């Protein structure tokens, strides 16, 4: 699983423009996206892990680490801003520490136990910078320095901050600000001369000097090919040069054996490829590379190791040794001057032995652990890793199987014991596994120690626990934003004299030149300790409608016009003026989010019945209703007694235990309302006035009948008994002359035999209107008194029918608030009557509001609220009819 870490320069110099019109930071962001697209072509890229680190101060520089997903990585990449310093050293250290978080916990480094090339986390660090001077809080640095103090436990066990499976590459942007003639030459991109180049070469990478967009694309394609699984090893020649071989394959004695000048192939810092197993996807190996020290059981600590092992090779030709069933590891070398030199010799049947200095028991002795050999086809050079001091072990094992037939004698055992003593103890475990594979599992006893002291083992365990804690802490801190700066500190230098105007200038000059002892300069320039310049907050936008001083001078006239239109609402726009600007000030990352904007837009088509709740699509029957959507306000409306499940039970309709059907919420049983016609003129103006009728609606206590039942017959489910004709829509109204409730017995036609007919009758009286009424209008007045029910519909007085126009302004808002209050659960109806008192307009408007509230209360079965609203409606009717009765008396 390769790790691809992008280290992006976020210093202020990355804001410079190129000839393309984009900034360096924009080019860096685009380069990351292009690299990811190129990398996605490889099927092996499925296991890639991407990380993002910037030049911000730690720990805020880590934008995407071990736990962040691809979406977080892309979001943080798009939100990068260039506003800091070029702290390349600290950023590199933070990147290496991030990669080394889990190494002690997982045991990849295997300190003191040999270096296993097949234990690796291949990582590629790609730095994109402008190559300018390195700056930090104290000044400008000429050289690149990485901090030595690392918060990561166990960092002292390695001399360098990086590891042998981590390589650093740098894309140094040198794009000019003005377009130049296309004079670039085809070929490899040259390395840059900045300070990061040397650091790249130390880790096994390189830098690229990018001058055009075409060169950048070429570099990215090259980097994609560099993502390989392997470790970096430093190969060095030891001993004399090999004899020169002529064209005929024989040694040429005329040429000297040793060259006095160093050749490029004498020292190479290159990668060896560690191929993963095609079946498991994980590299498999058997033998480690030797440590550069002999592990001593009496040593309390481990000496620090170098990141890249120094493997020395001898140029003495030897024949490769191998026996049957003995495992060995084979690693291909990256093309280098060393591989080129070996292949040019054209000797695929000869090898050069490799070893590590100070790996033996005695510091001056080093035994080979493998050899370098060209492939048979002379296409590559391979490193074969064998058991330690394999020239001694392989003949012993060959005799064991071929001569002794797995029954060694005393002499063979003594030779084998001497070999084990000269071998580093960390080779015992892999050797025992190899012997078990070969069929000799009992040659090495189980009580042999690995070679590390108890103090070293306990120290490594303690480091592993500390590394786990530090890893969790760093993972939690990833993504945190740095605290905003309160301001810029300002020093007052206006009252201070220049050094050239000081009286002791000559003495200061002599101190600098060394003529007299240097005297410290008084640097107290009367600094204001608490004086700061406030920083501009980019997130805060000027509120032109709140503070007139935020309006630029050139926009004053335009702003006054917009404020006037916003105040007077001269336009028909639904968007207010202060919201109009914010719609066009959206971040680039949110411009494509159309779904959230569409959710706030009103529906282009109105609902068939806006008062009905939305149907919930349930599994199975699409007409099935969700019972949770039924709101029952009154506790006494529930059927408290035991339900009778027998069929054909026809009990008393008014009994509390009788079962009734629930009212269907389906809009199929109701007739759709005709939308009102929007007009700009006002109808219904009369002598009643508009303001004189306020404050007359009050909640009135519920009247009780003689038998304790509520006025008007009610069923067990709380629904009111509705008549079948239009005159009997509201059977619960109070007689206008006597003030007594109408008895239930006088209304035989009000009680329908079925609950569903009652519901339909109630809905018809609320929704249906007579054909004599004005088209697209509603009848607002309730049915007349008992004496008026015999009057024909054609002879109805003019004031019995009221035509209502659509509500505008405050009344429209009041209607919405009244509906919301009616729908709220509970028995406190004071808020409803308080809102009805605020209705402005004639009596017809107040009737309309009360009728609408009664209709909504009937949907939610609020019987008590309906009766109180009916009582309030009767009071309005009485007060309206009182002047007419007085006029009749005077006319007599």
From Swiss-Prot:
Is Lipoprotein there in the keyword field?
no
**Keyword annotations for this protein?**
Chromosome, Nucleus
What's one Pfam family here? INT_SG_DDX_CT_C
> What Gene3D superfamilies does this protein map onto?
von Willebrand factor, type A domain
Short sequence motif named Inhibitory loop, residue ranges = 630-637
Q: Where is this region: Disordered?
A: 665-692, 711-754, 771-793
Please state every residue range assigned to the domain named VWFA. 3-227
Specify whether Disulfide bond is a keyword of the entry.
Answer: no
Q: Please name the InterPro entries in this protein's record.
A: INT_SG_DDX_CT_C, Integrator_subunit6, VWF_A, vWFA_dom_sf
Q: State a single Gene Ontology molecular function.
A: protein-macromolecule adaptor activity
Q: Which PROSITE patterns match?
A: VWFA
Mind telling me which GO cellular component terms the entry cites? Answer: chromatin; INTAC complex; integrator complex; nucleus
Cystine pairs: none
Entry's PANTHER family? DEAD/H BOX POLYPEPTIDE 26/DICE1-RELATED, INTEGRATOR COMPLEX SUBUNIT 6-LIKE
Per UniProt, subunit arrangement is: Component of the Integrator complex, composed of core subunits INTS1, INTS2, INTS3, INTS4, INTS5, INTS6, INTS7, INTS8, INTS9/RC74, INTS10, INTS11/CPSF3L, INTS12, INTS13, INTS14 and INTS15. The core complex associates with protein phosphatase 2A subunits PPP2CA and PPP2R1A, to form the Integrator-PP2A (INTAC) complex.
Q: Copy the domain comment.
A: The inhibitory loop acts as a regulator of protein phosphatase 2A (PP2A) activity: Asp-633 and Glu-634 residues mimic phosphoserine and phosphothreonine residues and bind to the PP2A catalytic subunit PPP2CA active site to block substrate-binding.
Q: What is this protein called?
A: Integrator complex subunit 6
| UniProt source species | Danio rerio (Zebrafish)
């Amino acid at each position: 699983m390769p790790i691809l870490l992008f280290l992006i320069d976020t210093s202020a110099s990355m804001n410079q423009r190129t000839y393309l019109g984009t900034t360096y930071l924009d080019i860096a962001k685009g380069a990351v996206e292009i690299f990811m697209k190129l990398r996605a072509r490889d099927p092996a890229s499925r296991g890639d892990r991407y990380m993002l680190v910037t030049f911000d101060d730690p720990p805020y520089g880590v934008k995407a680490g071990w736990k962040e997903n691809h979406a977080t990585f892309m979001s943080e990449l798009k939100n990068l801003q260039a506003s800091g310093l070029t702290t390349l050293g600290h950023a590199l250290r933070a990147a290496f520490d991030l990669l080394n978080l889990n190494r002690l916990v997982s045991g990849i480094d295997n300190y003191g136990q040999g270096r296993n090339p097949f234990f690796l986390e291949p990582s590629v660090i790609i730095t994109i910078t402008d190559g300018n001077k390195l700056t930090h809080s104290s000044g400008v640095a000429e050289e690149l320095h990485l901090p030595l103090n690392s918060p990561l436990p166990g960092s002292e066990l390695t001399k360098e901050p990086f590891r042998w499976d981590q390589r650093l590459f740098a894309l140094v942007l040198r794009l000019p600000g003005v377009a130049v003639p296309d004079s670039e030459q085809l070929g490899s991109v040259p390395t840059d001369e900045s300070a990061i180049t040397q650091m790249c070469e130390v880790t096994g990478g390189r830098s690229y000097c990018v001058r055009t967009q075409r060169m950048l694309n070429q570099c990215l394609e090259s980097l994609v090919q560099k993502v390989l699984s392997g470790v970096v090893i430093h190969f060095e020649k030891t001993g004399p040069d090999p004899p020169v071989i002529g064209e005929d394959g024989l040694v040429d004695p005329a040429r000297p054996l040793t060259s006095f000048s160093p050749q490029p192939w004498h020292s190479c810092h290159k990668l060896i490829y560690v191929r993963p197993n095609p079946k498991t996807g994980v590299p498999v190996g058997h033998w480690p590379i030797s440590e550069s020290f002999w592990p001593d059981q009496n040593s309390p600590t481990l000496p620090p190791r170098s990141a890249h092992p120094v493997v020395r090779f001898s140029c003495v030709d030897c024949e490769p040794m191998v026996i049957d069933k003995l495992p060995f590891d084979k690693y291909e070398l990256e093309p280098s001057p060393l591989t080129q030199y070996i292949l040019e010799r054209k000797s695929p049947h000869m090898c050069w032995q490799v070893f590590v200095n100070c790996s033996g028991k005695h510091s001056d002795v080093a035994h080979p652990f493998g050899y370098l050999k060209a492939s048979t086809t002379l296409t590559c050079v391979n490193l074969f890793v064998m058991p330690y001091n394999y020239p001694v072990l392989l003949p012993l094992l060959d005799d064991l199987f071929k001569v002794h037939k797995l029954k060694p004698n005393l002499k063979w055992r003594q030779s084998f014991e001497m070999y084990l003593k000269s071998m580093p103890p960390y080779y015992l475990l892999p050797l025992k596994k190899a012997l078990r594979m070969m069929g000799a599992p009992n040659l090495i006893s189980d009580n042999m120690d690995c070679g590390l002291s108890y103090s070293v083992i306990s120290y490594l365990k303690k480091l592993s626990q500390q590394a786990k804690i530090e890893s969790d802490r760093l993972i939690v801190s990833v993504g945190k934003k740095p605290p905003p700066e309160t301001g810029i500190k300002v020093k007052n230098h206006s009252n201070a004299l220049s050094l050239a105007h000081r009286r002791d200038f000559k003495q200061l000059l002599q101190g600098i030149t060394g003529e007299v002892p240097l005297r410290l300069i008084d640097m107290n320039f009367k600094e204001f300790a608490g004086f700061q310049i406030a920083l501009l907050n980019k997130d805060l936008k000027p509120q032109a409608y709140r503070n007139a001083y935020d309006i630029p001078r050139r926009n004053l006239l335009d702003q006054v016009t917009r404020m006037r239109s916003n105040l007077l609402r001269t336009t028909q726009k639904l968007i207010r003026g202060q919201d109009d600007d914010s719609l066009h000030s959206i971040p680039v990352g949110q411009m494509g989010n159309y779904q959230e904007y569409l959710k706030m837009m009103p529906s282009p088509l109105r609902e068939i019945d806006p008062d009905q709740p939305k149907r919930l699509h349930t599994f199975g029957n699409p007409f099935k209703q969700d019972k949770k959507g039924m709101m029952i306000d009154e506790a006494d409306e529930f059927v408290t007694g035991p339900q009778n499940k027998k069929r054909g039970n026809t009990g008393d309709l008014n009994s509390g235990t009788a079962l009734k059907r629930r009212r269907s919420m389906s809009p199929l049983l109701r007739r759709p309302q005709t939308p009102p016609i929007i007009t700009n003129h006002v109808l219904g103006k009369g002598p009643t006035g508009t303001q004189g009728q306020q404050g007359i609606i009050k909640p009135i206590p519920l009247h009780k009948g003689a038998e304790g039942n509520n006025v008007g017959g009610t069923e067990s489910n709380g629904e009111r008994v509705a008549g079948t004709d239009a005159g009997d829509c509201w059977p619960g109204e109070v007689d206008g002359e006597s003030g007594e409730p109408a008895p239930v017995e006088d209304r035989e036609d009000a009680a329908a035999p079925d609950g569903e007919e009652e519901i339909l009758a109630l809905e018809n009286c609320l929704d249906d209107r007579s054909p004599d009424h004005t088209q697209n209008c509603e009848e607002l007045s309730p049915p007349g008194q008992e004496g008026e029910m015999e009057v024909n519909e054609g002879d109805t007085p003019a004031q019995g029918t009221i035509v209502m126009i659509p509500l505008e302004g405050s009344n429209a808002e009041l209607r919405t608030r009244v509906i919301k209050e009616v729908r709220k659960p509970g028995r406190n109806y004071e808020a409803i009557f308080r809102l009805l008192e605020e209705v402005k307009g004639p009596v017809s408007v107040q009737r309309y509001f009360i009728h609408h509230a009664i209709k909504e209360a009937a949907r939610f079965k609020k019987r008590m609220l309906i009766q109180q609203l009916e009582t309030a409606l009767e009071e309005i009717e009485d007060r309206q009819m009182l002047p007419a009765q007085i006029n009749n008396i005077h006319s007599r």
